[in-house]
Amino acid sequence: MSQKTNENVERYTQFLQKPQKPIQPYICSTLNDFQEERDFLANNIFPQLNELCNSWGTYFKAVDLSWSALKAPKSLPTHLFRQYSCLRSQRLKLCLDYVNSCFPFFICMLGQTYGDFLPDYSHFMTSKVTRLSSLSKVENLYVAAKNGYPWVLENPSCSLTEFEIIQAAFLNESQFQYFYFRTGTTLLKALDDEKKGERLPSSSSTNEEETLRIGKLKAKIISKGLPVRFYSDLHELGELVFKDWSVVIEKLHPATLMIENIDYKHSFERFYHEEFTEKCKQMCVISKESDRTFEILEKFALKDVELDFNNVAADSSLDSVPRFFRINPTPTYKSILLLSREHGCGKSTLIANWVNYFKKKHPSMLLIPHFVGSTCESSYIMSVIHYFITELQYRNYGTQLETDILNEDSDGLVFSFLVEVFIASISLKPCILVLDGIEELIGIYGISGQKVKDFSWLPHSLSPHCKFIMSTVSSSLSYKSLCARPDVRTVELISTGDEETKLNIFRKHLSIPMMDPFEQSTQALRKKPDLSPLKLTILANELKEYRINHNEFQCMKEYLEAVSVQELWELVLKRWIEDYSWTFQPKRANSDTVASGEGLDSWVADALCLLCLSHGGLAEDELLQLLDMLGYRNHYKVTALHWAAFRNATKQWVQEKPNGLLYFWHQSLSAVEHKLLGVITPVESSPCSFQTPMNHKKTHFHQVLIRYFQRQTSFWRVYQELPWHMKMSGCLRGLCGFLSSPTITDFISKIQSLGFWTRLHLIHFWNVLLEAGYDVSEAYLLSVAKIKADQCHTMRKSGTLSVLQCRLIELTVLDKCRLMFFIGSFLKFMGKTNEAEELFLSVEDMLVQSQSMTDMLLKVQNAIGELYLETGMTQEGFQYFQKAWSSMLRLSLSDLEDSRDLVKQKVRVLDNLAKSASEEYLKENHILEYATEISNLLDNNPRDQATMKYIEGVLMFVAGNTSLAKMKLRECLNIRKSLFGKKNMLVGEVMEFLADLLFFPQRDSKKSQRKQVLKYYKQVIKIKENAETLAKSSLLRKQLSISLSDTLCKLAGHLLASDSCHHVMIEAVGYLYRSVDLRVIHLGSSHSSIHGIHGILHLLREIEWIRSRRYWPQGMSQQHSEGSRNGFSLWEHLVKLNYHSAQSSNTVSSAMCMNADKLHRARRMDLAPQTISDKSKCAPGKGKKKPIICISAEEKIQRKTQNNAEIWNGSGKEASKKKTDYSSNILSLGKMNGLIKLSRQRILLAKSESGEGEITTIYHHPLPWPVSTKNPGESEFISEKWLFHSPDYISISQKSFLQRRLHIETKLLKTSNDINKE
């Protein structure tokens, strides 16, 4: 590939590997004279910096506490005075807390004022302070000193601004701090009288001291060498700030760039887990118990044999183990370790820290952690499995995370297939998977929660390469189900440790130095020995905040009386609301969803409810805007300052993701739902919960969120939240309109690589609508009509209209085609094949008429051909692949060097041609040479590599190099198995081709090869059966059934060709009957392939004759004397039974077609050193070995006139071969009876449907030469798509046909009964 492409890929890979942390500078200035600058930066410069950060996968958010917005007590309502006093008393502490949380980023603006300060410290006596809320704005430095900043008392005369600068720049050092000094002697904005009145009494001496102080402060900043900029107006300030912080962004994120229109959900998910691990690391308290747990986990992860528990620790014994944990001692190989504790015992923190520990100690080991509940997507079982798959394949193949192989295959959205891919992925190389909190897993897309949590989907045995570490609570369904598995080792953590460990946990989270009354708190803790780490963490965090405005000992006493974690959370929520919140009085009678008299408690309660009900979390500005919508405005407005105080108090529990969205850090905060929403059932449990009267409040919040996100301009935020709330509130009509709207379709269709989460939820929401009676095709076709009629042409100005208000403007032909093609592709996936075909053809028409010969035309023609191919219209499909080939030739190879998508499209065209084109076409157009050139342009994507090997295998076979073709196909099979497992149709495709290659040239084939063919055919049948049950389109199900019939016949033919013993014949008969059943059901009696029934039954009659002779009373002597005759007679009918398909195309995709001279060339090549032995060209049996004679479609057409005389000599035998794997249990007489009865019913039904008294049989063609054992290698290969097809017709009596069928069935049953009696 070109150097430019390689550079882009390298930069992209660096972006994926490096977490992008947000940039959040703290804004510092004197309070009253920089409001204009703050507003200018917030409205003009910071949004630009945020856009720049977005291009690097992160965000920019300045933290401006805006104390000037806090109104004086006299202007506040009486019931708000308490909140004002509490906030005012902790002003300095709050500022210093945020300086620390924003470190290392800091922006400071200084002018000619110094800010409020105490000129005479002697009047400030902290010992006389009785009510903290009564302190002045300056005197509240006592609160800061008591809560972590004792150094402020050493400098009591400093202003608030200088305190912030000391904390940011003098007590800490950072290269990301910038100071902006305003020049001039006048302020940009005059101070109003009210603000002047808040200042301390002014005098000339005070003004002089203030001027002196600000001068000294600036001199200290400059002398320390901190970066200082000077500005004279707003424009100059904006330029300086943008230039400085653009450099910061580029310095922190070098050489990383997000590719436009790529869905980066997986990358962000990955960062979230890393961030979660880092936060847990900060809270971990190391103890002897944690060290011993680490050792157990490490030994389990590294060893393939049972742990020697006597050596868990050098100084430990088994007697001491139960003090901390209990281990299931079953002495068998274990692949799963289940760590269990009750809620709040620190499992997640312990595991996250072990992950950090293990990665540092064993950096070469592949360890992938996943913490359920860390994001909204992390709880869905399919997202969890997909996350593991993507990470494993990225580590093994280097595939780009957002363009992984599953994004190219709709099978990846089927749960059973996804599990198969997962099993294949963990078998690639040694790996350690960590899944924390499995009791929180939930189902989606038709997967029930019970199935998810009981782990019935997980195979009974995992690959020995994989070690799986899980954690859950002991009372969960997951724990009970996994304990029943023999490959699970359980480690139950039953103790937090000794008393000192508990106190260390408490101290860790309290983190307040010089706290004198701490010992009194520890005495209270010692009286409660059953405190879990979660309770200790809650108590410590609450004590830090509660003690500012309350009696801390009363707080401790009240909290310790709580019996459960939920009761404790209810007390905490009550305290939060009392200290930080207020409500307002206006009636809400307009609400059509809230019951009469039902009010909202307070803004804190409302904010927590909104956060709880959101799908992916909410940003701070979103929450503040939502509160404004709920009525908190004017005097009741929740300012950024009020919000900052609340967030500072709850930062341990309401945390921020790397993308800036807030979420509940611990699952125990579900108490919010129970306490504030009055809901017992989890949010995700039922989309119909809105119908329950007791959930009216919950439904109301969902509707508020709907109204809010309908007005938003960010597509990803709208797509993540709006459809979710529409579903949860029962607004299904709106959901249908949203998903099918041209605007949303336009956004989604522009994404180059639609991520797994995006596709999964789109399909999930449509499934909800389908269950409610909505028609997906009707909704989308209405949008198509609007697109064609140019009814979406409203002008959009960036950032001024919401996503739903946007209209597509001046759609070009290519735009319309892109939209319609996306809709067609989605309808095809949803099983609406006819509508998809119509749209594809319409798009092709539009592109051809507009002479837009772009890569889109290539993509559309390829899609049409694939649709035809999948529904059995092979010839029509081939015509479109020819068109795609012509379009492809218009693109030079140099055009492909910078377009990975174009290379993929060309690979798909070649793949489809190999499946549908004739041998002559492939040779005349030099497809093999072109495929060789394309293969040199492929990247390291294993899916594309496997497809190319398949193409080369087919083309090399056509060229006559059978041995090399087999080698390529085996390579393709191995890659696809490692990618998709054993049940994917792509695996079945190449497996059947290989089986055909190995089966048809049966001369002196080895026994092992015959077994391999049998195994392949049976596996292909299972794959097709599974695919048929999951297919959404009736046309696709029909074609899969017909294809299954072909494979069943192939298997029967292989069985009969390999062996003629009794049980093999019985099994083959079952496959043949089932093949007939499938054809009668899906094709009807008039289809040409149905006429092969007579040929099959003619073969069955011969089988019955052999079996009846074999079991004469004379026994084995009779059988021995007839052995030679039996083998010859069976082979005589077997070789006369041509292998045809219901298809009418002349292809070489999954089987072989060569005439005699081609076969001779292939045979000569087989004798070469690098080729396979020509023993594989003959089918041995108990008698004389006979070749299988086959002829091409062209030869069949040429011999039309000869077919009538040969009709009885064999029609359905190759079809019989295709009945590969009905079941090995077909030997059961009961099943045989049912099968025969079913076949009889199908034939009678076919008779009634046809309205005729005869069945026409088309089959047999004369053999091109006499069958002779002297020419064992002169057989031909033919395509699977030729099975059951011939152009000739002849009529036979339906009555005699049925009589013979009944006669054979009766004899088979009689013989089987005799055998059972013996």
From Swiss-Prot:
Keywords, alphabetical: Cytoplasm, Repeat, TPR repeat
Gene (name only): TTC41P
Localisation: Cytoplasm
TPR repeats: 399-432, 653-684, 817-850, 858-891, 991-1027, 1045-1082
PANTHER family, A to Z: DDB1- AND CUL4-ASSOCIATED FACTOR 12-RELATED, DUF4062 DOMAIN-CONTAINING PROTEIN
Any one Gene Ontology cellular component term annotated for this protein: cytoplasm
Name this polypeptide is given: Putative tetratricopeptide repeat protein 41
